[in-house]
């Protein structure tokens, strides 16, 4: 039986990576793909082969022009090959759109099958980090495809390559509007809100500025998981940050603890340790258990009867409240697989000592 909950882990299990590559390889008509990075050679090469067999490829990414601008270092530009790879794909016929607030990670093939998840297209994410993903078929794809097409048409930057070999990044200004009716009766969840950075003169975002932009948000769905829990809450993420800007979530977690719900958290103590520490200490203080994992980048939230998987960090500054992120509610079988994933992660961790 095919498992639609997909995992990469530090033991070498790579069902998510293999599912991504297989979905690109079997595409025949079109691919719509969004990711924060396009560095992993296996994915880039698979997209190139799809272009060679006549598949129409549409890409949404974020080359972080706000980060790699005048102050960028040579090392930063050399280490992040995303712009180079997207330029090469554009030369080969891919249609490239760039969003300054994109952090979502998903792939749609032939409007029939999709994968959403936590993994960036980087070697670390696709080879040894713990990552979570979900294979999607059926009606939910329509909502995901609608959002992709809307944001692609209103991308902050379009990438153009001419037959003469010239390449250009063209900024465009438009107003993105989301039709809520297109997302109803779907398991898909989103964040689609311009970050506060758009207020800076040198930052541009075509995403809606309104936090009530017509989507069922990832944040509200996480809150519902917390508020409806009676036995336990498991939250797995790369980082916990800026909880002062997530007061609704923090207060909901406190109320859950007061009604006897057991709360366990997993986050990275590798590349995100310094970012995590302040927020983790606050969560431990109110009664949460925290497990630090060296290589975790998986992202999901569960209770005993519901859950969702998503691309966003638990970060009050970016992701849950602003930016472009994608998530999906879990079926009961998928939730059970996510519980097993959580248990495996905890088995690889050492519980953080109580710092009260």
Regions from the PLM with identified roles:
Residues 1-95, 101-102, 108-356:
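Charged, low-complexity intrinsically disordered terminal segments
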């Amino acid at each position: 039986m095919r498992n639609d909950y997909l995992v990469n882990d530090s033991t070498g299990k790579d069902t998510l990576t293999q599912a991504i590559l297989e979905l690109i390889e079997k595409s025949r008509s079109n691919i719509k793909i969004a990711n924060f990075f396009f560095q992993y050679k296996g994915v880039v090469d698979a997209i190139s082969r799809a272009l060679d067999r006549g598949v129409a490829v549409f890409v949404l990414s974020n080359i972080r022009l706000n980060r790699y601008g005048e102050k960028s270092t040579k090392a930063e530009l050399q280490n992040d090959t995303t712009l180079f790879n997207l330029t090469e794909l554009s030369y080969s016929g891919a249609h490239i759109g760039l969003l300054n607030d994109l952090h979502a990670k998903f792939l749609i093939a032939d409007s029939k099958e999709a994968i959403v998840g936590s993994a960036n297209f980087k070697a670390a994410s696709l080879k040894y980090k713990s990552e979570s993903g979900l294979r999607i078929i059926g009606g939910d794809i329509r909502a995901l495809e609608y959002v992709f097409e809307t944001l692609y048409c209103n991308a902050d930057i379009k990438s153009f390559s001419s037959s003469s070999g010239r390449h250009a990044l063209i900024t465009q200004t438009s107003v993105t509007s989301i039709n809520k009716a297109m997302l109803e009766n779907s398991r898909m969840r989103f964040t689609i809100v311009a970050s506060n950075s758009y207020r800076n003169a040198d930052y541009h975002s075509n995403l809606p500025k309104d936090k009530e932009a017509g989507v069922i948000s990832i944040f509200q769905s996480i809150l519902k998981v917390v508020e409806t829990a009676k036995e336990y809450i498991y939250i797995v993420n790369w980082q916990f940050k800026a909880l002062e800007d997530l007061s609704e979530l923090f207060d909901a977690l406190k109320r859950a603890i007061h009604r006897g719900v057991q709360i366990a958290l997993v986050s990275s103590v590798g590349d995100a340790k310094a970012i995590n520490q302040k927020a983790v200490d606050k969560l431990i203080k109110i009664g949460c258990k925290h497990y630090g994992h060296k290589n975790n980048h998986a992202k999901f939230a569960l209770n005993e009867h519901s859950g969702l998987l998503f691309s966003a960090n638990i970060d009050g500054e970016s992701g849950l409240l602003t930016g472009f992120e994608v998530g999906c509610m879990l079926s009961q079988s998928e939730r059970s697989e996510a519980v097993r994933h959580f248990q495996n992660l905890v088995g690889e961790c050492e519980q953080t000592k109580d710092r009260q």
